[in-house]
Amino acid sequence: MGAIAAGIAMAGAAIGGGVGDGIVISKMLEGMARQPELSGQLRTNMFIGVGLVEAMPIIAFVVALMVMNK
């Protein structure tokens, strides 16, 4: 039962992380297309946003391991 719960948690986190990354990157590209002079600042903010979005699957992985070993 724990393995199924861990798999579902990881699947949800992976889907959420992928969608979140796609949204962050697409908005950054839209901003660069509108204001190319801000590309450096937008790129920096995009990397910070992607890092924050990717924290969720990592946390879900740790929780999934804890659920499996319980």
Swiss-Prot record:
F(1)F(0) ATP synthase produces ATP from ADP in the presence of a proton or sodium gradient. F-type ATPases consist of two structural domains, F(1) containing the extramembraneous catalytic core and F(0) containing the membrane proton channel, linked together by a central stalk and a peripheral stalk. During catalysis, ATP synthesis in the catalytic domain of F(1) is coupled via a rotary mechanism of the central stalk subunits to proton translocation. It comes from Levilactobacillus brevis (strain ATCC 367 / BCRC 12310 / CIP 105137 / JCM 1170 / LMG 11437 / NCIMB 947 / NCTC 947) (Lactobacillus brevis). It holds the Pfam family ATP-synt_C. It is a multi-pass membrane protein. This is ATP synthase subunit c. Keywords: ATP synthesis, Cell membrane, CF(0), Hydrogen ion transport, Ion transport, Lipid-binding, Membrane, Transmembrane, Transmembrane helix, Transport. PROSITE patterns: ATPASE_C. GO terms for molecular function: lipid binding; proton-transporting ATP synthase activity, rotational mechanism. Its main location: membrane.
